Amino acid sequence: MALHTVLIILSLLPMLEAQNPEHANFTIGEPITNETLSWLSDKWFFMGAAFRKLEYRQAIQTMQSEFFYLTTNLINDTIELRESQTIGDQCVYNSTHLGFQRENGTFSKYEGGVETFAHLIVLRKHGAFMLAFDLKDEKKRGLSLYAKRPDITPELREVFQKAVTHVGMDESEIIFVDWKKDRCGQQEKKQLELGKETKKDPEEGQA
């Protein structure tokens, strides 16, 4: 996200308008269905963003990479967010819960007693989604991009670049993540391997 983290950005978000970046016209976010929620329940990689708002831009510049897991709860209409962010040579972990409103297609989060919202923009055929920020405010507008793979395809890059220019920003304002600087992925891989070894040991002892 970046998002100073997905968390920080959602905590700052006002009510937003979303667009379909693959078409010329703007539309209000589509309703969130169970199918969409199931699709969102996955591992996501922050790919890049273009922000006019200073807090958001500074957050991206201090972050080398970010990935996170979304786990939806259809009973409570909440989403568990578990986030891993590389800042410098350190890996920072965060977790929280997000709400969502099915009818207007928004995420929500309570922060400091205030509920804030973000419209979801799904790019399903690209395995990606976007969040839009203050599109009507020239000084605060922004777009961020997330995908299911860390390697952005030329087609998805072009879609995002066109979306950025369509909302009145310039391609030069886009900051893409350099996944070669990621540290959290390496740590996660080691933890998974350690977990597998831990499971093997008791079985070997019983053999």
Swiss-Prot record:
It comes from the Eukaryota. Glycans are attached at residues 25, 34, 76, 94, 104. Disulfide bonds join 91-184. InterPro entries: A1A_glycop, Calycin, Lipocln_cytosolic_FA-bd_dom. Its main location: secreted. It is found in: Secreted. Residues 1-18 form the signal peptide. One of its GO terms (cellular component) is extracellular space. Belongs to the calycin superfamily. Lipocalin family. Contains a beta-barrel that binds various ligands in its interior. This is Alpha-1-acid glycoprotein 1. It comes from Mus musculus. The gene is Orm1.
